[in-house]
Amino acid sequence: MAPKKKVTGLIKLQIQAGQANPAPPVGPALGQHGVNIMEFCKAYNAATESQRGNVIPVEITVYEDRSFTFALKTPPAAKLLLKAAGVPKGSGEPHKTKVAKVTWDQVREIAETKKSDLNANDIDQAAKIIAGTARSMGITVE
């Protein structure tokens, strides 16, 4: 078995699916770790091609020899809620001004999508986490 490579950095970014390019914020974040920026952009865009229109968080592990691996996460709950509610952004005063409504079915659907990234044992707990996010954005859950 080959010896393990030493990890020198972990970079977390949220990039539009299929639209990674060397411009900020991607270029500077990767450049300071010595990663080949174009190589990452091509690999990320190829991996997220099917999810265009969503913001996909990515965790990039950089190794000593400047090679890297990356893991894709599920889209942020806030973005999924905004899409489900059909509004461009959440409320500036979430507990006073409500901007939209979502149903429990929509919340459960988002919880199903996010289950792998959430710290929940079952779908009901995951749905409550998503409902809390919705509440903090001024979206009513019915």
From Swiss-Prot:
Described function: Forms part of the ribosomal stalk which helps the ribosome interact with GTP-bound translation factors.
Species of provenance: Mycobacterium sp. (strain JLS)
Family the entry assigns: Belongs to the universal ribosomal protein uL11 family.
Subunit-level organization: Part of the ribosomal stalk of the 50S ribosomal subunit. Interacts with L10 and the large rRNA to form the base of the stalk. L10 forms an elongated spine to which L12 dimers bind in a sequential fashion forming a multimeric L10(L12)X complex.
GO molecular function: large ribosomal subunit rRNA binding; structural constituent of ribosome
Superkingdom per UniProt: Bacteria
Gene this protein is translated from: rplK
GO BP terms in the entry: translation
PTM description: One or more lysine residues are methylated.
PROSITE patterns: RIBOSOMAL_L11
Signal peptide: none
Protein name, as recorded: Large ribosomal subunit protein uL11
Any single Pfam family the record assigns to this protein: Ribosomal_L11_N
Keywords: Methylation, Ribonucleoprotein, Ribosomal protein, RNA-binding, rRNA-binding
Disulfide bonding pattern of the chain: none
GO CC, alphabetical: cytosolic large ribosomal subunit
